[in-house]
Amino acid sequence: MSRRYFGTDGIRGRANGLITPELAMKVGQAAGLVFQRGEYRHRVVIGKDTRLSGYMIETALVAGFTSVGMDVLLLGPMPTPAVAMLTKSMRADLGVMISASHNLFEDNGIKLFGPLGFKLSDDVEKQIEQLLDESLDKKLAESASLGRARRIDGVHDRYIEFAKRTLPRDLSLDGLRVVIDCAHGAAYKVVPEALWELGADVIAIGVEPDGFNINKECGSTAPEALSRKVREMRADIGIALDGDADRVILVDERGHVVDGDQLLAVIAQSWKEDGRLSKPGIVATVMSNLGLERFLQSNGIEMVRTPVGDRYVLEQMLKQGYNVGGEPSGHIILSDYATTGDGFVAALQVLAVVQKLGRPVSEVCHLFEPLPQVLKNVRYRAGKPLEDDEVKSAIHAAEKRLNGHGRLLVRSSGTEPVIRVMGEGDDREMVEEVVDTICSALGEAAAAAA
């Protein structure tokens, strides 16, 4: 069965476009029916980021879950990894995060977690999708068996304590001036407080959500404001999270960006030296730079590649027994601590290395020279541009030209109508030429189908 609703990271789309109150209520009903197992009161945990549409979707989900007899625990704005953690901690049958991650406020989404805090498998998502296309009126709970909903206090403190426990008790961030950019998103309360409790001198930006400004010219996808603030305040480091805080990008004291590949290098090398790698390797995706792979190999660390998407990274980590994985975008999964990407916990591991070595972030966090990499996006409205003959011909010619000199990756986004074209190699000029040629062909195909 084809997947009509679920992408690589839950269900995502324009609020009141794809993501309507009707769909959200139906998701609540369908997911609630799938996760009702055993003769006991069933419960679901729901968190959200700071988008205006979160109120609408939250209310619709509550209606859906309670109508099939599930109790609902409402967390309010919380990072995605916190929702995953609390789903397991609070013994819930299911966890829900209302977020479109790094997208702007117009979009929203619904991410689902199983009782152990892991994202749902493809098979479970298919079960839910099947129910979404059915009438569920005859499967609703009897009047006396309807669920209840209530808001839970103190959840921020639970996540703060969890994050702090990922560092040694004797490690303090005292003496570090840290600028944190929360992207006006889900982490705006918890992360600045946690850094302060760990002893850092905290300067917080992106902590004034108004429902519209999430990820707008801030956060991990737009670190320029953070870079300026770090230089202005003469800070030691900048931390940029995205709207739901499952991604992180750092900025060194000079204002230079440290992406997910460099973070993986820092954590992998440090954990290998400390004997904390479960096996001598990590998991990355096809988007990770060849420079990272060469660096890791020179340090006796294997790198296993997966398709794009943190769910596939985690899948391989669990299957092969690795405890570190991630993506250049800043999804870093440390399975010793979390069941999904946790931007703040990943940042803390790097801060621990900085404190341990007593060296500037610019020295600690730039461990390899990335190969020139060009990444461009082509947006389309209709059709399937990748199936166009001219596009196929352009891709074939580019692969032939790069053979032995670099890598080429052309793929559809799993979360939005975009084709991503990535080229990588020792010769930047040649890489730019082949990427531009493919993008031009894609643009023409997209225009013809519109």
UniProtKB/Swiss-Prot annotation:
Keyword presence, Lipoprotein: no
Catalytic machinery residues: S101 (phosphoserine intermediate)
Gene Ontology biological process terms in this record: carbohydrate metabolic process; peptidoglycan biosynthetic process; UDP-N-acetylglucosamine biosynthetic process
GO molecular function: magnesium ion binding; phosphoglucosamine mutase activity; phosphomannomutase activity
Post-translational modification summary for this protein: Activated by phosphorylation.
GO cellular component: cytosol
Binding residue positions for Mg(2+): S101, D242, D244, D246
EC primary class: isomerase
InterPro entries found in the cross-reference section: A-D-PHexomutase_a/b/a-I, A-D-PHexomutase_a/b/a-I/II/III, A-D-PHexomutase_a/b/a-II, A-D-PHexomutase_a/b/a-III, A-D-PHexomutase_C, A-D-PHexomutase_C_sf, Alpha-D-phosphohexomutase_SF, GlmM_bact
Residues modified as Phosphoserine: S101
SUPFAM superfamilies: Phosphoglucomutase, C-terminal domain, Phosphoglucomutase, first 3 domains
Highest taxon, organism lineage: Bacteria
Record keyword Magnesium present: yes
Protein purpose: Catalyzes the conversion of glucosamine-6-phosphate to glucosamine-1-phosphate.
Family: Belongs to the phosphohexose mutase family.
Database matches in PANTHER family: PHOSPHOGLUCOMUTASE (ALPHA-D-GLUCOSE-1,6-BISPHOSPHATE-DEPENDENT), PHOSPHOHEXOSE MUTASE
Name listed for the protein in its UniProt record: Phosphoglucosamine mutase
Biological source species: Rhodopseudomonas palustris (strain BisB18)
